[in-house]
Amino acid sequence: MRPGLPPYLTVFTVYLLSHLPSQRYGADAASEALDPHAFHLLLNTYGRPIRFLRENTTQCTYNSSLRNSTVVRENAISFNFFQSYNQYYVFHMPRCLFAGPLAEQFLNQVDLTETLERYQQRLNTYALVSKDLASYRSFSQQLKAQDSLGQQPTTVPPPIDLSIPHVWMPPQTTPHDWKGSHTTSGLHRPHFNQTCILFDGHDLLFSTVTPCLHQGFYLMDELRYVKITLTEDFFVVTVSIDDDTPMLLIFGHLPRVLFKAPYQRDNFILRQTEKHELLVLVKKAQLNRHSYLKDSDFLDAALDFNYLDLSALLRNSFHRYAVDVLKSGRCQMLDRRTVEMAFAYALALFAAARQEEAGTEISIPRALDRQAALLQIQEFMITCLSQTPPRTTLLLYPTAVDLAKRALWTPDQITDITSLVRLVYILSKQNQQHLIPQWALRQIADFALQLHKTHLASFLSAFARQELYLMGSLVHSMLVHTTERREIFIVETGLCSLAELSHFTQLLAHPHHEYLSDLYTPCSSSGRRDHSLERLTRLFPDATVPATVPAALSILSTMQPSTLETFPDLFCLPLGESFSALTVSEHVSYVVTNQYLIKGISYPVSTTVVGQSLIITQTDSQTKCELTRNMHTTHSITAALNISLENCAFCQSALLEYDDTQGVINIMYMHDSDDVLFALDPYNEVVVSSPRTHYLMLLKNGTVLEVTDVVVDATDSRLLMMSVYALSAIIGIYLLYRMLKTC
């Protein structure tokens, strides 16, 4: 290359000619002989020669300044490059190379006036894999779209001894605007609602125009974020840590990702699989912030298996990374853990869109479970990475919504309650809650009550945590069917006991968890906002706090909703303060605090030591929440000496255990008479006699009772009838015995 020739010119021309169809350059181009002595430089690109004519000319001066000129001929354009005073090197190039939108697009992205010094400086700006990272890896596993869970209706199967309710679908009229889908094809493919100009203005890449969608997760400010860009053939993970040029991870089928001279794709391939490549574009000056790129095991958990198996990908990759991020308290940080999690999330979206390539039929329950799993990891990404309030654009899945609509209004499409939970979850997360009927939420609330009863005297199973995770999200993402949502909310609150919190901290000590739901506790979605390390230390002053307790409280802080705005009578509660909110019935709520916090009818607790206070405020579910720090209407707490189960007057109530000096210890929800009997049965040791411990019952009618010394009167009509039936059966058996003996 002659001195003074911009480096882009030759390479760019080679690129253009290799991408343009072979054609004549001028009327007599086909008859011209190729004389090598007639050209200053001859390049041959795949049989298509580029000819640079040798010609020296002089240029007249004008106003004592030199100018180079471009001579336009019929079939060529000449470029004049200064060599010495009054002497230029002139290169003639075919005009067709510079005509049309493709040429214009590329010419607008290169600087033909770039100096050699700037060119050399740019060569040393970006990190090369072979030179600066030295961590290239290839994976040879076979890639095939499939689902390792087969037709399994739930990711975590239920215990064999748990009876799963069947869905009862009432007679109903199909909505007039219903257009349900009858296919699962393209079910997990999000709607590409944008046309993107990718890599526009990037130093290394030519821009490309393609259908795409963007998702941004902004942390503390505009300069700290992770962005996901998904296209048909590849995805891009953009990571910015206060940088003017963010790091790019580009993965997929990449023939449309084109590099500017002098760089080549091979310089930036960090990982390679059977079908896809991973490119990393990062400046050398930023390697100290992204030092994990040099780790030989970076992204192994995402790529070292058949990642086109969506279920395996979610379990082995995303959930593995997400569990690590959550347990280590790395949400709202940008390091190796969160970058790997973001990559696994993008890979899950990429793989999910290709599930129809498996070519196998998929059942409706399995399809709903997979789609709910995709929306659930999106929800976690927003919870973990986005600032408050979140600004992330939600991905839309129109085919999944159509399928859910069909299943909801067509008999026998879904049979188990677990599928209904996922169907409702999908509609709620796709802003379609107006399509959710009341009967669906009613059955989900009944399922929550079943889990409540199943685990009154036992720890939550992995299956129960999975289902409560989904239901807890429903509670805080919908505005309709408030009665049913209030019931689910109080169930989650009642399950958030000290025993659950203790068991949860023990779970965190285990090194392996397959799914995020394994780390879910009802405390995350409940009305209990009074758990803190300081409070636990006060409750157990002589106990050594396990190392997992801070991690457990960090998880609670991360996973708890940032607002209670879906409940009109609770939305104003300041979530930074300590309180417990109890939606015991359709119309009555209680807020338990150590100071006046919300307007309503308050019941100050008098049996606490000096310096400690406990205030129970009753509110009406239809009354708008109003924050107040002043004393207002108060009622006294009545001591109850006995409780009658007649007419279930004590159903839908909360049993509150508190200590004279430490305040609230436990809260238990009692939905029906069986729960009341269980709580007050001395053999269950729920109510334990102690000089410092007291028990209050918060009733559905707005009354608060002291029940520390209560005696249960179980002689209600229902129990009497059961006794009569039992006595009659005994007498009948005895008479039958006498008759047989006589014979």
Swiss-Prot record:
It is found in: Virion membrane; Host cell membrane; Host endosome membrane. Residues 24-720 are virion surface. N-glycosylated, O-glycosylated, and sialylated. It comes from the Viruses. The chain crosses the membrane at residues 721-741. Residues 1-23 form the signal peptide. It is a single-pass type I membrane protein. Residues 742-743 are intravirion. It holds the Pfam family Herpes_glycoH_C. InterPro entries: Herpes_gH, Herpes_glycoH_C, Herpes_glycoH_C_sf. One of its GO terms (cellular component) is host cell endosome membrane. HAMAP family: HSV_GH. Belongs to the herpesviridae glycoprotein H family. This is Envelope glycoprotein H. The gene is gH.
